[in-house]
């Protein structure tokens, strides 16, 4: 059975769940008010093998590292280990999201092209929307083709804040 260590931390944008495995690889990072969605994703990815959630304090130092990100040490999120469920395509999208540098954005079509799947922007968008590791797998760095702040599971206001925090100038 998979044991997931969890802690809820305070951030400038509200409480954030940090969930990792016993090897301290992030499995989920989600805003508190979307915890039902997080549980649904955990069930989808790990119900078959079974999992239990265990309260922990700063598991593997991950909570402190996320606090550092919010305090301005932006590059720290690039160092955080992750382990995700999902389909092979979803994992490919999520891995590619981590290559978008802090302070930069990409639109869904560009991300699809980078994956070698031109024309798959909608599929990329769907995979982006089911990302269980918010912020660390930076789905907030993907915007609409015309520069619009398209959907972000944590809310568009958070997306805008995160992009400003990372130095992306919003017009």
Swiss-Prot record:
GO terms for biological process: DNA alkylation repair; methylation. It is found in: Cytoplasm. Signal peptide: none annotated. PROSITE patterns: MGMT (PS00374). Changing residue 139 to G: Eliminates the activity. Keywords: Cytoplasm, DNA damage, DNA repair, Methyltransferase, Transferase. One of its GO terms (molecular function) is methylated-DNA-[protein]-cysteine S-methyltransferase activity. Its EC number is 2.1.1.63. Its main location: cytoplasm. It catalyses: a 6-O-methyl-2'-deoxyguanosine in DNA + L-cysteinyl-[protein] = S-methyl-L-cysteinyl-[protein] + a 2'-deoxyguanosine in DNA; a 4-O-methyl-thymidine in DNA + L-cysteinyl-[protein] = a thymidine in DNA + S-methyl-L-cysteinyl-[protein]. GO terms for cellular component: cytoplasm. The keyword Lyase does not apply. The active site is at residue 139. Belongs to the MGMT family. Involved in the cellular defense against the biological effects of O6-methylguanine (O6-MeG) and O4-methylthymine (O4-MeT) in DNA. Repairs the methylated nucleobase in DNA by stoichiometrically transferring the methyl group to a cysteine residue in the enzyme. This is a suicide reaction: the enzyme is irreversibly inactivated. This enzyme catalyzes only one turnover and therefore is not strictly catalytic. According to one definition, an enzyme is a biocatalyst that acts repeatedly and over many reaction cycles. This is Methylated-DNA--protein-cysteine methyltransferase. It comes from Escherichia coli (strain K12). The lineage of its organism: Bacteria, Pseudomonadati, Pseudomonadota, Gammaproteobacteria, Enterobacterales.
